[in-house]
UniProtKB/Swiss-Prot annotation:
<keyword id="KW-0133">Cell shape</keyword>
<feature type="transmembrane region" description="Helical">
    <location>
        <begin position="160"/>
        <end position="180"/>
    </location>
</feature>
<keyword id="KW-0132">Cell division</keyword>
<feature type="transmembrane region" description="Helical">
    <location>
        <begin position="229"/>
        <end position="249"/>
    </location>
</feature>
<dbReference type="Pfam" id="PF00953">
    <property type="entry name" value="Glycos_transf_4"/>
</dbReference>
<feature type="transmembrane region" description="Helical">
    <location>
        <begin position="330"/>
        <end position="350"/>
    </location>
</feature>
<dbReference type="GO" id="GO:0051301">
    <property type="term" value="P:cell division"/>
</dbReference>
<dbReference type="GO" id="GO:0071555">
    <property type="term" value="P:cell wall organization"/>
</dbReference>
<dbReference type="InterPro" id="IPR000715">
    <property type="entry name" value="Glycosyl_transferase_4"/>
</dbReference>
<keyword id="KW-0808">Transferase</keyword>
<feature type="transmembrane region" description="Helical">
    <location>
        <begin position="88"/>
        <end position="108"/>
    </location>
</feature>
<keyword id="KW-0472">Membrane</keyword>
<keyword id="KW-1003">Cell membrane</keyword>
<feature type="transmembrane region" description="Helical">
    <location>
        <begin position="256"/>
        <end position="276"/>
    </location>
</feature>
<dbReference type="GO" id="GO:0046872">
    <property type="term" value="F:metal ion binding"/>
</dbReference>
<comment type="similarity">
    <text>Belongs to the glycosyltransferase 4 family. MraY subfamily.</text>
</comment>
<dbReference type="GO" id="GO:0051992">
    <property type="term" value="F:UDP-N-acetylmuramoyl-L-alanyl-D-glutamyl-meso-2,6-diaminopimelyl-D-alanyl-D-alanine:undecaprenyl-phosphate transferase activity"/>
</dbReference>
Length: 353
């Protein structure tokens, strides 16, 4: 909106620069989240929209009165900042906002069900995955119709591994959406544990998106160019800004939880960025914490069903370390460090090709 008004009509050149608009979006989203979150917390407490705490984690029972669904606020702030600072005529921008709002809506439905039932079950698995599947499929098909190429790239290699047939690419993208959104959802179990790794991953992906959308940088770095995708940089920075605003209230001890309203939206948007910037494989490294958390659940369930034995004291793995006696803050900060290092290694792939 501001972009169209100030650059399109008044020809204010500052607004033609992607980096300026992304920076402006960051601060708008940050301060808007900072302003709205206390009001949301008061409203949520009045409505008793508290996070149900699992009886299997007795050390977390002191969190039972903490309101949830804070993700609604940072998603809203991101959308407002994006509408103001991004070009709304760009399909990548529109699809990015659809992903954020759509995945957040599914998360909201799940959160609402948990609050009403006062347990952690939420929606049925069939309903939840069905909604996520349809949303992922629609966005993937639209990306295909947009003309996003279907080459599969591996990190540190300048040439693609191979070109996927369209139907295979769409199926693969749907898998990336579903796996990433649920991986972030599983990670969101301690104060700030999902927020900071999401920030690191989004910052890394935003750099890749910026390079992919810039003809000079993509040519110099031998990176696959994706026409018009650079505008997504604005939304990514806005989401990072809103996450910093959310973290202000979510750091230990948390005043609010993001809930599925936030974690599914984050995972969906991270997946979207990875797909449009051809980083589906590299996402495993950038989102290493999310991958490890998910694998710990898969291995735990698989081991128990096949051998009647548990590999971990509790899954996801952050609870395993809590059960071993690690303080919550120690688990959180160490996971942050791992996430930061994995993203720094991922960024090296930009130059090493």
């Amino acid at each position: 909106m501001l972009y169209s008004l100030l650059y399109g009509y008044f020809n204010i050149n500052l607004f033609q620069y992607l980096t300026f608009r992304a920076g402006l979006g960051f601060f708008i989203a940050f301060f808007l989240t900072l302003f709205l979150m206390p009001k949301f917390i008061l409203w949520a407490k009045a409505k008793k929209a508290n996070q149900p705490i699992s009886s299997f984690v007795p050390s977390h029972q002191n969190k039972k009165d903490t309101p949830t669904m804070g993700g609604i606020v940072f998603v809203f702030a991101t959308i407002v900042a994006s509408v103001l600072c991004a070009s709304l005529g760009n399909l990548y921008v529109l699809l990015g906002m659809i992903v954020l709002v759509g995945f957040s809506f599914v998360g909201f439905k799940d959160d609402y069900t948990k609050i009403n039932q006062q347990n952690n079950a939420g929606m049925s698995v069939k309903m939840k995955f069905g909604m996520l599947f349809v949303l992922s499929l629609v966005v993937s098909v639209l990306l295909s119709l947009k003309g996003l190429d279907t080459f599969l790239y591996a990190p540190f290699l300048k040439n693609p591994l191979f070109e996927m047939p369209t139907i295979l690419a769409v199926g693969f993208w749907v898998l990336v959406f579903l796996s990433t959104s649920n991986a972030v959802n599983l990670t969101d179990g301690l104060d700030g544990l999902a927020s900071v790794p999401s920030i690191f991953t989004l910052l890394s992906l935003s750099i890749f998106v910026y390079v992919a959308g810039n003809a000079e940088f993509s040519k110099y770095l031998l990176y696959p160019k994706v026409i018009d995708v650079g505008e997504l940089f604005v939304i990514s920075l806005a989401l990072v800004g809103s996450l910093f605003g959310f973290l202000w209230y979510n750091c230990n001890p948390a005043s609010v939880f993001m809930g599925d309203s936030g974690s599914l939206a984050l995972g969906g948007f991270i997946a979207y960025n990875a797909i449009v910037s051809h980083n589906e494989i590299l996402l495993v490294l950038m989102g290493l914490i999310f991958v490890v958390e998910t694998l710990s659940v898969i291995l735990q369930v698989g081991s128990y069903k096949t051998r009647k034995k548990r590999l971990f004291l509790m899954a996801p793995i952050h609870h395993h370390f809590e059960q071993k006696g690690w303080a919550e803050n120690k688990v959180i900060v160490r996971f942050w460090i791992i996430s930061m290092l994995s993203n720094l290694v991922a960024l090296l792939s930009l130059k090493v090709r």
